[in-house]
Amino acid sequence: MTVYTYTVFLFNWENIGLMEQQNPDRLKKDRELIYAIVTAKGIISRFFWSILSFLITNLIFFFAAFVALLIYLLASVDNQFAFVFIAAIIFIIFYNIFFLSYLLFIYFKGQKAIENNCKYLLTILDIKSDELLPFSLLGSLRKGYMLDEMLLEQ
């Protein structure tokens, strides 16, 4: 059973009423698992788009600095263009420091949410970060089939 069909089944109101009558503890665990999956997806997508925007913005800044340097070298202009190039490089350095500190803030905020909200969330976040990002933010070596095994154990 995939996560999608499991979620659709779980949030069908008739099934929730039936499951509550049969085993209320099981329903609580299932709700916690679905909450963990949704929260992990949100955290990972925020990381992914933050890193992507960071790389794209850096490319734009470096291209602008490179164009300024080419204009300075090819044309006979004042030394003010060298100042523009140096200012662009300094701006890129400070932008990188600021944005990397922002990514660390998101990372620690996500870690705190993991510890406070759900026991399943750390495992799911490890699995999804391995699938979505070129490197694992949590240093995980787990594979996607662990999520299916965890659902089957429930």
From Swiss-Prot:
Disruption phenotype: Not essential, it can be deleted. It is a multi-pass membrane protein. The keyword Transmembrane applies. It is found in: Cell membrane. Keywords: Cell membrane, Membrane, Transmembrane, Transmembrane helix. The keyword Nucleotide-binding does not apply. It comes from the Bacteria. The chain crosses the membrane at residues 54-74, 81-101. One of its GO terms (cellular component) is plasma membrane. This is Uncharacterized protein MG149.1. It comes from Mycoplasma genitalium (strain ATCC 33530 / DSM 19775 / NCTC 10195 / G37).
